[in-house]
Amino acid sequence: MKTPDQRPEDPEELVYADDAVVGRAFRFSAVALVVLILAGAGIYGLLKPRKAAIETQMTRLAAPVAAAMPAAPVPVARFTDITASAGITFRHENGAYGKKLLPETMGSGVAFLDFDSDGDPDLLFVNGTFWPGHAPAGAAPSTAALYRNDGQGKYTEVTRGSGLDVPLYGMGVAIGDYDNDGRPDVFLTTVGGGRLFHNEGDGRFADVTASAGVAGDPKDWSTAAAFFDLDNDGDLDLFVGNYVRWSPDIDAKVGYTIDGTHRAYGPPMNFEGAFPRLYRNDGSAGFTDISAASGVQVKNPSTGVPMSKTLGVAPMDVDGDGWTDLAVANDTVQNLLFRNHHDGTFEELGALSGFAFDSYGNVRGAMGIDACRFTQDGKIGFAIGNFANEMTALCVAQDTPGGGSHPLFADEAIAWGIGGPSRDPLKFGIFFFDYDLDGRPDLLSVNGHLEEEIGKIQNGQRYQQPAQLFWNAGDAGFSAVQPAQAGEDLFRPLVGRGSAYADVDGDGDLDVVFTQAMGAPLLLRNDQALGHHFIRLKLKGTRSNRDAIGARVKLTAGGKTQWRDVTSTRSYLSASELPVTFGLGALDRVGSVEITWPGGRTQTLTDVSVDRMTVVEEPQ
């Protein structure tokens, strides 16, 4: 009998005596494999009949070095649960009535956005609703919940009359000012397509889905979505990931059980995948669906079915050409990496780049994803939260001396100290953020299982699971943070799903929010008191998109360099704040800030004040 954690493609369980040693082996194996493939191509080129000699070039990869365990102590920086005191009363509704329909256990996302343009982050919780014909007697339909930040981290619910008080089986959220009017708009993914809400500027949102042309198909189960400027024309386009081909009837036919008797939530291998959608923003004319022509709809070459079961997406310029690419996290099919060809089309490079599979060549159950230039030399890393008994992936860009035709990545989770500790839990929301303001991005994972009764058949698993926080010690790797260092509230067991960050109380450090499936969210205030300095930057595009999504910011201070990329799309079905935060540690001044705006224009600042937010407008 297969349990929910024993997926057909799972490798046998291995016990590692030394994760760092194994990490080194994995990384060298990846390099060796690339070299063998290239060498094989060269041999074939020599033996193949030809009219003229062909010169074969081979890209040599620098040998990676496994990180040692951090010697520096993890700082004490506590998080405090302020959910109730902040005025948050939302509770997620999944409509479950005993039939175990898959959307019920997937939860929903959350977004920080400044919808009223008063300078502090408001909150939007995505919600499910009751299945048709199964609402409890007298129960009002559930909707998303909008909370206005009244300053100092106190919130007031303003959902009623906002236009977002519409019953939907909601999943995820993307935030972006698609019409460049200075107000953030909202796209909600749902079981049943997508919904676009235009921010009217008076606390109300108008449903413009039909006129904008972004509804998708009523049969779509849309999940992760992202606003980004695919063509560098100054307005935001929209990527919408879909999960699987699903309906209540299809779900009922799966007939999956957890113990041979009782029905359970069917694993995604039992459902056919679904293509994502890509919409080009054509200004006042609305959006144009370019999904098929753009190359983002990839078929399995053997079966012809969609090779997408998307739960996460991360926009990021992976090859440094000034055009935003897309990394897509898929559940039980290979992850996809789409390189932007500058003409409205994308090339899928997941397998070729080393991004698609784990170190054994297997697919994983990928959920949330985030991208960050987390090293001192600015290497891109993709953190991907995976299923239980699968490690969190940390796909790190590799040096390719002499150039190369495409980017290369290797999963270095074990070598960086993340792999082993992250293996057991079922990871959903995940993001990088510098919680202690020391100048190094840390990593937070929000966890929770799919099955309420999983502990009865797997002693090592629980439905409610604690979050995991990894402190970045620089080149020495990451250390798992303990409750004594970050507080008990952060590690309270939850049925965790979505997650996001923002500075909710204006003190400069980053606070976090988690969502639960069929439960209340958790809003955690960062109460670190380390005396570290910071700068916060809010970018405003003029020639580029108003949100400056796709901009890259490079900070130099004290002989060290940090990078941040502007996007709100992070984690699982969620959106974090747009302003970027740089921790400075004990430094109280900044050398320079270099901004590369979408499209490639650069701007350098040398007089940025510390310990405050600075608004930077793109030069005309």
Where do the PLM segments sit?
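Gly/Ser/Thr/Pro-enriched helix-cap/hinge segments flanking short amphipathic alpha-helices
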Residues: 4, 14-31, 36-53, 75-78, ...
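Beta-propeller blade termini
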Residues: 107-117, 148, 169-184, 196-198, ...
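Hydrophobic beta-strand segments that make up the repeating blades of beta-propeller
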Residues: 79, 120-127, 181-190, 238-242, ...
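Asp-box/WD-like beta-propeller blade repeats and closely related beta-sheet repeat scaffolds
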Residues: 158-178, 183, 189-230, 240-269, ...
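Ser/Thr/Pro/Gly-rich low-complexity linker/stalk segments immediately outside membranes or between
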Residues: 46-71
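Beta-propeller blade signature
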Residues: 143-150, 274-281, 339, 396-397, ...
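Short, conserved, GDST-rich strand-edge loop motifs in beta-rich repeat architectures
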Residues: 56-57, 126-141, 242-271, 445-463
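Repeat-based blade/solenoid architectures
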Residues: 88-109, 162-174, 213-226, 271-272, ...
